């Protein structure tokens, strides 16, 4: 009989000086690993300045470029467009009161208020017909009018009389073929109870309009009319379509008023002059001139008058207006610049106001957030948006130009300061504006060629250089215990082109080394 193996027992350790055996240790319990949730209960805070932020309200106001109503006037004229408004209204009043066809051609560079002004006139001066026929004026309007026509309105003449009109506004960009404009006009006015017709040319549209002669005047506004010439079709067909539209607006058997709008200043000379079989066939022309800097400034101030405060410094608005007026006179471009400066200002101030700026580590960043960021409002930054923020926006527009082109616009003093800034950056790549100014003073004193500028004059030129896209100025946190913020300056140019241009000027050579 074989012996049953006995599992050996572990020898119990005893303390060296103990008489009794030591108490056997308790068996170790395995610890359960605790895994924390990857997804936190809430996500990191997201900075915002509140839904009623003055910044958000200002940007929204600048977005509505078509709503340039003079709040202090009920006549429907846009700011700085009173003369053009009166010309359009006189044209409409005469054509509608006489129940005759006529045409008007409105032209001008982009952003001069052509579309906005016509939209304003249509909204304010063409009123929908009242549903109730109880008033004598309504009965008089509808006595000889087909109420089933679409877009039917009434137009009040200067003497108080009401005239029946049907008005529509069409953007020609949406048209695939120029000849489809006739069908588009018909679809805008057709009798809801009438048959569906195919309108392919002027004669078809004329046949539809003639029964309403002396009863209802049809007013058609064609925006971007020159697009009819750029469609994917032959120039002959495009020109023919445009000529037929203006010819239709001169026929005595219909009451058809055509208002064409386009950016092309020479469209009348190139195409409409072919109508000149008789001087009476040519459309009346109104030119919307580019806005001046003063007009742009007044429009912006007027738009912002509804806000509790204006967040821009007056000089910043004037500077932006002058730059935009000098280029194209496009008011929409000015709105874009102002909105862009607000966004830059917000980003910078949010960074400065953030209490967690620079304190997050990788363990605090959620890997798979499932809830939207917690929004927390912070005090809105004090102060107003100045020239430096406007300059940052303009610098983006000119950065595509070559360094040589940008330098050519500078005067000798501005070129000299640019040279000293570059030299200060060679000594210290993190140079601030103050350090660059100190280097400038030392360089001027050493050469004894020109009188040094004051600090505020130096800063003004730095702003100009930033506007030209040659330097960039950023507010950064300086190193050390003070933790204060300074304005760091840097350059954005092609150094080879820079030296090629600067070495051509003998007085600047000492500042290049």
Swiss-Prot record:
Report any one BP term from Gene Ontology: DNA replication initiation
Which family is this protein grouped under?
A: Belongs to the CDC6/cdc18 family.
Q: What is the documented function of this protein?
A: Plays a crucial role in forming the pre-replicative complexes. Interacts with the origin recognition complex (ORC) and MCM2-7 helicase complex leading to the linking of those complexes and loading of the replicative helicase MCM2-7 onto the pre-replicative complexes. Required for the initiation of DNA replication and then actively participates in the suppression of nuclear division.
Q: What is its main location?
A: nucleus
Question: Does Cell cycle show up as a keyword for this record?
Answer: yes
Location relative to the cell:
Nucleus; Chromosome
**One MF term in the entry's GO annotations:** ATP binding
User: Gene encoding it?
Assistant: CDC6
Q: Where is this motif: Nuclear localization signal?
A: 27-33
Outcome, altering residue 29 to R/T: Impairs nuclear localization
Task: Look up and give the organism this protein is from.
Answer: Saccharomyces cerevisiae (strain ATCC 204508 / S288c)
Q: What is this protein called?
A: Cell division control protein 6
Phosphoprotein found in the keyword field: yes
